């Protein structure tokens, strides 16, 4: 199969090819095979609009979905070549950052696998978020180029004009084929400008934020610490939705739509608030087609659905009207009319689209002018209904619904953990690959010692593979025979990497005092901090200082290791997750909408150590008290304390000598010798005088839960049982289930034509 492509491309055999030649040949093979698959088509089509799609490397995922992975692997192996080497050679697309983008990628996989006609719509970022480098124990940001001639991008001949205030631009469209597992294909549509100039980037990720023609799609989430950066974000968002809206209407017409019946031909899912301007833009385009304003607004409402991904007020975007007047003056009167319509109907400034400071509340517009509003975990949706969006819930109870997030098992089990996947197939059959709930069959083996022993062997092999990878890529030798305790996620105070760091200090001080743990402990972190998020970068600095401090300490380093993985991304997650023993899901209760890392860890046999937050609540319900470590205050307690406004972190600090010792250590002479005094002092003061995400109240319970997990780990037989229960109950968290629910209750798409 591959040999034929190699001969056609290079006139030689696989064994004679260089790595880049083989990669090009594999890319050609996959594009050819995917191109031969029928695309999902139907009268009604979904458009999943998102600012980010964290799709990860695509080579092996596509080979698996196309059903040719083993065949290609053997063909390469027979010629003395390694598919693993080619996987390492492939660049990872820089199109996303955290859970939002990874969820979107999982959803595209499931939409295609379920044979539903649905495409992603986003932007073709040249440098993505950034490539993270550590220098002097600090995060530094560098561009993260990924496009080359051997790219998954296929340039389309479609083009759309976008009118900004004062100038027009012509968008180009690139597609990435989305292969379904043993199914047909869909597309990820990515819009770009040919005029974007990568050479304007200098000194890390600095660039002229005002030259929109040259900078528009350079970076995901440009630094918003000043108005120029914030304005650029609005330019990006309007560019994305204007192109998307034009594409949607064009394709709907091609399928026979008269636009009055648009909702019968298109379903638009607004993924968080970044694509919100698609609502006024679609209304504007429908009015241009001769449809009256009120009817256009009704059509758009029946077509659009909104997914809320956050409980954090600062993440619900509110743009000054002056920004929209500058970027997209054509939609300003539309937004104003929508606001007048709402004000006349409800007479409540709390639900207005435009507030007293002349800011446009994107989430408010989404809720009023979408037919569905969903949260992404049971607890999250309940908090939206009862607290954060309660005013809207009283207006539109019928719109609110829950769709607990999910993950694609093709990537996070079949691809990331082939040892476990093969063992599961031998033990319970192959049905779980298409029907994840079939993993439940594994539960019947919980008392089978041979099965449990094999799970431990697989975990050990994956830990060795991770150790080898980190030695090769970062020069770090992980401790042998250790517990791997892992926290990998976007760096944010509410996710509370600072709590884990305080534990590392506590354990370091214990070992220094002669209290040696039964087994070595490796605390692994992976996280990027937004370039303008000062405290988040301070937390990374603290972790890197602890890493170095322990490396240098002969007494402690045999028993404790702190490691921050550089430039954490999907590829590194695929190495870390199968090797994990303890999954850190320690956000402040009520702040994490769902999380999906928790699901990936669970699927791969890690045991959750977490608060009752996001999807942790549902994991707890599924696995039971004995197979998860829950700690900390619940969401009701946290919400009540915020409402009272009486939290004082210093009270906890003064009353708990152990906590005080750990916090004070941040600014100790030892740490200041290793680190930046300004950064460490700023973080110390933030915790002592503010601690907005309540690290201190949960500290004692966190330490106790961690110690309990470490103690239980020593009973290997019982631990293997916990692993088995978690794996067997993970089927609920398949994104196939999530997408089926979206389709049954919101989109109402028919399966694509066979």
List where the protein language model places each region.
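A conserved ligand/cofactor-binding region detector
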Residues: 1-754
């Amino acid at each position: 199969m591959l040999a034929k492509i190699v001969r056609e491309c290079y006139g030689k055999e696989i064994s004679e090819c260089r790595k880049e030649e083989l990669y090009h040949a594999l890319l050609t093979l996959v594009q050819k095979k995917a191109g031969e698959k029928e695309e999902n088509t139907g009268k009604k089509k979904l458009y999943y609009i998102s600012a980010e799609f964290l799709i990860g490397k695509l080579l092996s995922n596509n080979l698996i979905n196309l059903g040719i992975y083993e065949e290609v692997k053997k063909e390469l192996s027979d010629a003395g070549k390694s598919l693993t080497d080619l996987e390492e050679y492939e660049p990872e697309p820089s199109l996303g950052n955290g859970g939002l983008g990874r969820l979107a990628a999982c959803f595209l996989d499931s939409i295609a696998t379920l044979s539903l006609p649905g495409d992603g719509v986003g932007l073709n970022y040249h440098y993505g978020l950034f490539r993270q480098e550590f220098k002097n124990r600090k995060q530094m940001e560098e561009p993260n180029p990924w496009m080359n001639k051997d790219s998954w991008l296929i340039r389309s001949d479609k083009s759309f004009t976008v009118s900004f205030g004062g100038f027009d631009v012509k968008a180009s469209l690139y597609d990435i084929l989305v292969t379904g597992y043993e199914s047909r294909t869909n597309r990820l549509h990515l819009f770009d400008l040919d005029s974007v100039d990568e050479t304007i980037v200098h000194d890390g990720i600095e660039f002229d934020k005002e030259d929109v023609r040259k900078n528009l799609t350079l970076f995901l989430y440009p630094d918003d610490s000043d108005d120029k950066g914030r304005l650029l974000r609005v330019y990006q968002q309007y560019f994305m939705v204007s192109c998307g809206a034009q594409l949607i209407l064009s394709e709907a017409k091609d399928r026979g739509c008269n636009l009055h019946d648009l909702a019968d031909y298109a379903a638009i899912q607004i993924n968080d608030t970044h694509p919100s301007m698609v609502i006024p833009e679609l209304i504007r385009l429908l009015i241009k087609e001769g449809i009256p304003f009120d009817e256009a607004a009704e059509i758009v409402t029946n077509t659009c659905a909104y997914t809320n991904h956050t409980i954090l007020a600062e993440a619900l975007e509110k743009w000054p009207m002056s920004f929209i007047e500058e970027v997209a003056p054509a939609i300003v009167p539309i937004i104003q009319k929508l606001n007048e319509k709402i004000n006349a109907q409800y007479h409540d400034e709390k639900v207005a689209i435009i507030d007293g400071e002349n800011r446009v509340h994107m989430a408010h517009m989404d809720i009023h002018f979408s037919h569905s509003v969903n949260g992404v975990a049971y607890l999250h949706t309940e908090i939206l209904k009862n607290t954060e969006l309660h005013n809207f819930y009283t207006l539109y109870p019928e719109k609110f619904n829950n769709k607990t997030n999910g993950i694609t098992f093709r990537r996070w089990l079949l691809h990331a953990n082939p040892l476990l996947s093969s063992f599961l197939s031998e033990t319970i059959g192959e049905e779980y690959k298409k029907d994840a709930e079939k993993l439940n069959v594994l539960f019947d083996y919980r008392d089978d010692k041979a099965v449990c022993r094999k799970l431990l062997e697989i975990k050990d092999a994956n830990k060795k593979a991770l150790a080898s990878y980190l030695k090769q890529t970062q020069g770090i030798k992980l401790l042998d025979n250790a517990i791997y305790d892992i926290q990998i996620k976007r760096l944010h105070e509410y996710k509370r990497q600072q709590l884990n760091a305080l534990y590392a200090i506590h354990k370091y001080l214990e070992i220094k005092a002669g209290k040696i743990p039964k087994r070595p402990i490796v605390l692994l972190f992976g996280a990027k901090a937004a370039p303008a998020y000062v405290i988040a970068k301070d937390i990374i600095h603290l972790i890197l200082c602890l890493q170095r401090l322990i490396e240098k300490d002969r007494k402690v380093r045999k028993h404790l290791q702190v490691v921050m993985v550089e430039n954490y991304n999907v590829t590194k997650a695929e190495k870390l997750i199968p090797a994990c023993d303890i999954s850190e899901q320690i956000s402040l209760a009520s702040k994490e909408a769902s999380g999906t890392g928790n699901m990936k860890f669970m699927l791969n046999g890690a045991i959750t150590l977490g608060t009752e937050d996001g999807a942790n609540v549902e994991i707890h319900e599924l696995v039971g008290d004995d197979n998860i470590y829950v700690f900390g205050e619940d969401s009701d307690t946290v919400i009540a304390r915020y409402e009272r406004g009486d939290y004082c972190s210093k009270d906890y600090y003064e009353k708990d000598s152990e906590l005080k010792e750990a916090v004070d250590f941040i600014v100790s002479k030892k740490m200041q010798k290793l680190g930046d005094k300004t950064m460490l002092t700023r973080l110390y003061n933030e915790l002592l005088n503010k601690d907005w995400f309540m690290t201190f109240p949960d500290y004692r319970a966190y330490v106790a839960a961690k110690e309990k997990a470490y103690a239980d780990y020593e009973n290997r037989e019982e631990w293997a049982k916990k692993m088995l229960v978690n794996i067997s109950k993970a089927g609920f968290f398949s994104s196939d289930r999530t997408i089926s629910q979206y389709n049954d209750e919101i989109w109402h798409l028919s399966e694509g034509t066979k």
